[in-house]
Amino acid sequence: MLSQQEISDRFEIQDLLFHYADLIDRKQFGELRRSVFTDDAQIDYSAFGGVVGNLEETIAFLEQSLTDALFPNTQHFNGNIQIRLEGDSARGRVMCFNPMEMAVPDGATHVFFLGLWYVDDYRRTAEGWRISRRQEEKSWVFNTPDFMHFNA
């Protein structure tokens, strides 16, 4: 049976995951510093051609790549959240279904879908649970533009 602390920790981590998705979809990347990641976080978005680096490198990448002009709409739906608590740290695996609307040169938009997993480490801080390591793991893609080639 889960203790009250374990139940609370799981809910807090789930809220953190949903908060991350909301900030990404609203393009509030700077807020990731304050309320999602630890200062020393390491993030690996290479499964879909993104950056591998620290928090500042990741925020710079997001600000440059997920612009309103290029991606007017995105949605990151998290589910099948698996969390293994280990005191003040935890590990997790989170499914993400990610529809993306992309602007194309003729003025239209193109919608494609990404299926992925986030493989995470979490740490309890004075401000609450934060992600200390995140790695995207590709599961599948659908209807991506021909020029997009993602790592296997």
Residue ranges and their predicted role:
Residues 15, 53, 117:
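Short, well-structured alpha-helical interface segments that form or flank functional binding sites
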Residues 29-98:
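A solvent-exposed, acidic/Ser-Thr-rich amphipathic alpha-helical stretch
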Residues 3, 7, 49-52, 109:
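Charge-dense, low-complexity intrinsically disordered segments
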Residues 1-31, 35:
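Short, low-complexity N-terminal intrinsically disordered segments enriched in polar/charged residues
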Residues 67-152:
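A beta-strand edge to alpha-helix "cap/lid" segment located at domain peripheries
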Residues 6, 18-19, 44, 69, ...:
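Residues at structural and domain junctions
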